[in-house]
Amino acid sequence: MILLISDLHLQEERPDISRAFLDLLDGRARHAKALYILGDFFEAWIGDDAMTPFQQSICQAMRRLSDSGTAIYLMHGNRDFLIGQAFCDAAGCTLLSDPSVIELGGEQVLLMHGDTLCTRDLGYMKMRRLLRNPLSLWILRHLPLSSRYKLARKLRSESRTQTRMKSTEIVDVTPEEVPKVMAAHGVRTLVHGHTHRPAIHKLMVDGQPARRIVLGDWDRRGWALQVDEQGFQLAPFEFS
């Protein structure tokens, strides 16, 4: 069994989500061969050198799962792209490139966070290119902690404001971009998060039937994609 999740947006202000994640680690994930986390794992991450006690507790829980034999793979999201190798080493997880193609359920599957599919959101795409530039990443990681905290708060506030102002079409994936990206990677299944619109979409790629599986965000309930001998099963679950 393989589990895939995304968009938990873990933060101290939402202990219900944190407890649900810890329950997953102590429960279903213990029986999984691997757990994939496809971005926006944390609501914000300003650097491995600034881990709070809350973030350290999450890191330690992940390490316990990793030590038990479940492989953990973590992909950057737009909220936590400053997660680095130090955190991954401590948590016992592997940092996964976005995009990545893996074998899943007997086929090649493309994994993405999903933000790069939203090409109609021109303002966001411009900001993403700026922030993900290697020079920008170096500067961000070397800013004083106080400056990083202020910048993180500013970016989160602006993101919420912009999301409310933009149409749903702009902040969703661009329909034409999906088959183009899937064809470029030679896959018929794509799994991503980011949009907070869980669903399984059918489409055609190079004249062949394909599917796009969108993981759900964790808010009032959690979401997970389970891949086993029964196939690909996307389903929500209630927080205990």
UniProtKB/Swiss-Prot annotation:
<feature type="binding site">
    <location>
        <position position="7"/>
    </location>
    <ligand>
        <name>Mn(2+) 1</name>
    </ligand>
</feature>
<dbReference type="GO" id="GO:0005737">
    <property type="term" value="C:cytoplasm"/>
</dbReference>
<feature type="binding site">
    <location>
        <position position="194"/>
    </location>
    <ligand>
        <name>Mn(2+) 2</name>
    </ligand>
</feature>
<feature type="binding site">
    <location>
        <position position="78"/>
    </location>
    <ligand>
        <name>Mn(2+) 2</name>
    </ligand>
</feature>
<dbReference type="Pfam" id="PF00149">
    <property type="entry name" value="Metallophos"/>
</dbReference>
<dbReference type="GO" id="GO:0008758">
    <property type="term" value="F:UDP-2,3-diacylglucosamine hydrolase activity"/>
</dbReference>
<dbReference type="InterPro" id="IPR043461">
    <property type="entry name" value="LpxH-like"/>
</dbReference>
<feature type="binding site">
    <location>
        <position position="196"/>
    </location>
    <ligand>
        <name>Mn(2+) 1</name>
    </ligand>
</feature>
<keyword id="KW-0441">Lipid A biosynthesis</keyword>
<comment type="similarity">
    <text>Belongs to the LpxH family.</text>
</comment>
<feature type="binding site">
    <location>
        <begin position="78"/>
        <end position="79"/>
    </location>
    <ligand>
        <name>substrate</name>
    </ligand>
</feature>
<dbReference type="GO" id="GO:0030145">
    <property type="term" value="F:manganese ion binding"/>
</dbReference>
<comment type="pathway">
    <text>Glycolipid biosynthesis; lipid IV(A) biosynthesis; lipid IV(A) from (3R)-3-hydroxytetradecanoyl-[acyl-carrier-protein] and UDP-N-acetyl-alpha-D-glucosamine: step 4/6.</text>
</comment>
<dbReference type="GO" id="GO:0009245">
    <property type="term" value="P:lipid A biosynthetic process"/>
</dbReference>
<keyword id="KW-0444">Lipid biosynthesis</keyword>
<protein>
    <recommendedName>
        <fullName>UDP-2,3-diacylglucosamine hydrolase</fullName>
        <ecNumber>3.6.1.54</ecNumber>
    </recommendedName>
</protein>
<comment type="function">
    <text>Hydrolyzes the pyrophosphate bond of UDP-2,3-diacylglucosamine to yield 2,3-diacylglucosamine 1-phosphate (lipid X) and UMP by catalyzing the attack of water at the alpha-P atom. Involved in the biosynthesis of lipid A, a phosphorylated glycolipid that anchors the lipopolysaccharide to the outer membrane of the cell.</text>
</comment>
<feature type="binding site">
    <location>
        <position position="40"/>
    </location>
    <ligand>
        <name>Mn(2+) 1</name>
    </ligand>
</feature>
<feature type="binding site">
    <location>
        <position position="166"/>
    </location>
    <ligand>
        <name>substrate</name>
    </ligand>
</feature>
<keyword id="KW-0479">Metal-binding</keyword>
<feature type="binding site">
    <location>
        <position position="40"/>
    </location>
    <ligand>
        <name>Mn(2+) 2</name>
    </ligand>
</feature>
<keyword id="KW-0443">Lipid metabolism</keyword>
<feature type="binding site">
    <location>
        <position position="159"/>
    </location>
    <ligand>
        <name>substrate</name>
    </ligand>
</feature>
<feature type="binding site">
    <location>
        <position position="9"/>
    </location>
    <ligand>
        <name>Mn(2+) 1</name>
    </ligand>
</feature>
<feature type="binding site">
    <location>
        <position position="163"/>
    </location>
    <ligand>
        <name>substrate</name>
    </ligand>
</feature>
<feature type="binding site">
    <location>
        <position position="113"/>
    </location>
    <ligand>
        <name>Mn(2+) 2</name>
    </ligand>
</feature>
<keyword id="KW-1003">Cell membrane</keyword>
<keyword id="KW-0997">Cell inner membrane</keyword>
<dbReference type="InterPro" id="IPR004843">
    <property type="entry name" value="Calcineurin-like_PHP_ApaH"/>
</dbReference>
<keyword id="KW-0472">Membrane</keyword>
<dbReference type="InterPro" id="IPR010138">
    <property type="entry name" value="UDP-diacylglucosamine_Hdrlase"/>
</dbReference>
<dbReference type="InterPro" id="IPR029052">
    <property type="entry name" value="Metallo-depent_PP-like"/>
</dbReference>
<dbReference type="GO" id="GO:0019897">
    <property type="term" value="C:extrinsic component of plasma membrane"/>
</dbReference>
<keyword id="KW-0464">Manganese</keyword>
<feature type="binding site">
    <location>
        <position position="194"/>
    </location>
    <ligand>
        <name>substrate</name>
    </ligand>
</feature>
<feature type="binding site">
    <location>
        <position position="121"/>
    </location>
    <ligand>
        <name>substrate</name>
    </ligand>
</feature>
<keyword id="KW-0378">Hydrolase</keyword>
